Amino acid sequence: MALFDGWVHCPRCANELTRRDNAVECGSCGFVLYAHSAVTASALPEDADGRVLLARRGIEPFRGSWDAVGGFVDEGEHPLDGLRREVLEETGLAFDPHELLGIWMGRYGLDDRATLNLFWTGRLAPGRPQPADDVAELRWFGPDELPPPRELAFEGLVATVLAAWRNQHP
């Protein structure tokens, strides 16, 4: 449970914490903190020519690899609101989600955090997408022009998602 590495004392009463299978617990005040998968919301924006927009990551992990546009959903944020926020932050354009492509489990970062990843297809607002935030480059790819798996982020996750997208575009 790498998520709780370094957790020794209770944030409420400062007494020692005890580790359980997927949580830390304080025997003094009863505080319990459970480990949960982090939720992500990502977009596969499509254009009128049937292409998909991918983002080249500008940060670790997987800096320089191709990824879907998106990121982590904030605490208490609806996944669709997080999706729209992330797409706007990374492309400068609003996103209209059309269809939930799928939900996949993944891992993120040096602490190997479990993630629950939601992917939508849809359209960007008119305009030219501009890379921003943690994106180094944005590029449109046709179904037969997708980057090879070795150039994709997150050890098979993005490749699996793009295969699902490509199956919708024979």
Positions of PLM-derived features:
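Short cysteine-rich clusters marking metal-coordination/redox-active sites
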Residues: 10-13, 26-29
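Nudix hydrolase/Nudix homology domain
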Residues: 1-7, 130-170
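A short coil-to-beta-strand element that immediately follows conserved catalytic motifs
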Residues: 19-20, 94-103
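Active-site-adjacent beta-strand/loop module that shapes the phosphate/pyrophosphate-binding cleft
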Residues: 104-128
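Conserved Nudix-box catalytic region and its N-terminal flanking loop in Nudix hydrolases
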Residues: 47-89
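Short, flexible, mixed-charge glycine/proline-rich loop motifs
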Residues: 1-6, 15-21
